[in-house]
Amino acid sequence: MYSRLFYLKSSYIIYFEPLFSNAIINILSFINSLASPLTIFCFALSAQALSTIFYFRIFIFIFHSWILLFHFYFTCSFKTYEHQHSKMVPAYRMQSPRALPRTYLYVWPYK
């Protein structure tokens, strides 16, 4: 039903959405919407200019693959959380000693 970030000892789930504010999610979603056409343009431009040099070809391939994976990851991560904020009710919350003040880690029981 909901996407899960990771499991804690197979009995608890930490969801991705409560750890970040809506503002951060919206900014990353906006950047993600620009990523695909910008990636294609930059890759085509750099590949045409540097394709004669072998090491640059390897670099372009790795860099382009990383951008595509980044784009795919955020597309999958944020798409399911756009309209689900009111449906998610935590079982309990903990305050992390390493987190900012008034920042809580919400944990849901695994069902």
Curated annotation (Swiss-Prot):
It is a multi-pass membrane protein. Keywords: Membrane, Transmembrane, Transmembrane helix. It is found in: Membrane. It comes from the Eukaryota. Brain. In the hippocampus it is mainly localized in the granular-cell layer of the dentate gyrus and in the CA2-CA3 subfields of Ammon's horn. One of its GO terms (cellular component) is membrane. The chain crosses the membrane at residues 23-43, 58-78. Its main location: membrane. This is Putative transmembrane protein CXorf1. It comes from Homo sapiens (Human).
